[in-house]
Amino acid sequence: LREVVVAVSNVIGSQRVGVRFAPLFASTEEERVYLGLVESDPFNTYVEAIKVLEDANIAYLSLAEADWDNAPDLPDDFYRAAREHFSGRILYAGAYTIEKALRVLENGYGDMFGFGRPFIANPDLPERIRNGWLLNKVDPSSMYGGTEVGYTDYPEYCE
């Protein structure tokens, strides 16, 4: 990790570098294929990696949480440790609700949040969040289907 981050930073500058991790802290009873590494000690593994990124002075750290229906949440002590060891911007993504993002933001653990599926169903998502408007529900049956249906046809909010 260190060698790659340093090499890229030397070419484009560390403030143009971001790194994404997808830490998985627990499994579920659900059978699934994990596309990545399931660590025996994810807390210490990722905290040590975050320290490497802090030392490299990169611009941001992106933490992608598992986003299936019964996915485990990141533990609170990991949120705290990530912020404690990384002074740049921290972006969280992966099944974030507005409420969860606000909790992480208010605790000072994160700076930015990715809302993939809610954005698909709510083309005006920032205005909905700002105004406390209800969100459209995502129709999962139309996702990943190969057409524009379910991607460009959700309505904007109207009273």
Question: What are the functions of these language-model segments?
Answer:
Residues 1-159:
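Flavin-dependent oxidoreductase catalytic cores
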